[in-house]
Every structure is written in structure tokens, then in C-alpha cells.
């Protein structure tokens, strides 16, 4: 499977976002705009969701994320412009390494299909293994998300 090519500045921005959000998880997207990788940070509203309805949202923002819908939709619209695309959705793990958890997979799915099959999901760790970054993409043959190498350029 093809690797994820990611600009150094975008990777650095994702890591900075994770450090700034700690001890909460961060989330965002990388858009490809005119051949450049541009990071869009999203507000993690998981703490508010948990506070307002802990039965429906049992995890707080230290162990889960929920992007602010208006920010997410703005990035999706921006990615639909000519010469643009949503390249990456990213989030951080604050207490564990950078792996694609069952919760991450569930959030990336729409029923039995990936919600955004063309988008790569990046998980960064800012605690247990600071700076660890791993990428995952849908593999139709495996019917699952598989790890792909990251080429930083």
C-alpha cells in the first residue's frame, strides 16, 4: 500500500497541537490545498459532551475526541474545492501509544464501510511515547484499516 507523504511543517503542527491540548486529546485534519499540506485544528468538544450526557458519552476528552461539527464541516467543504482534498484526519492519544484503537475504527466507519475511504487517519502520541506518529488507511481487500508508512518531505 502506498505511503502517506506528509510535509514536515504539517507533522510539526500536529505534534504541537497534541502537546498544547494535553492532557486532553486533540483532533484535526490536513488538507491538500494547491499541492501544499495545510493543518486545520478542530476544537475537541468531548469534555462538554461527557459533562452534558455522561451516559451517552462515557469517555471524557482525556481518552476520546469529538471534533466541533462546524469546524469539521468547514474543513470538508474546503477539501471539496478544485485542486483540494482532505488528506488526513488526525488525533492524539494522551495515555497510550499511537495505535488505531477499536474506538478510532468505530468513529471512522459508517456502518460496514469507511466514512472517508480516501482519507488517511494519523494518530500521534504525546505522553507514553512522545512524538510517536502512525498512519492508517482503509484496505478494501482486508476490509480494515492497516498501517501505512509515513514519508516526511
Label each PLM-derived region with a short phrase.
Residues 1-86, 97-153:
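Conserved beta-strand-loop surface patch within small alpha/beta domains used
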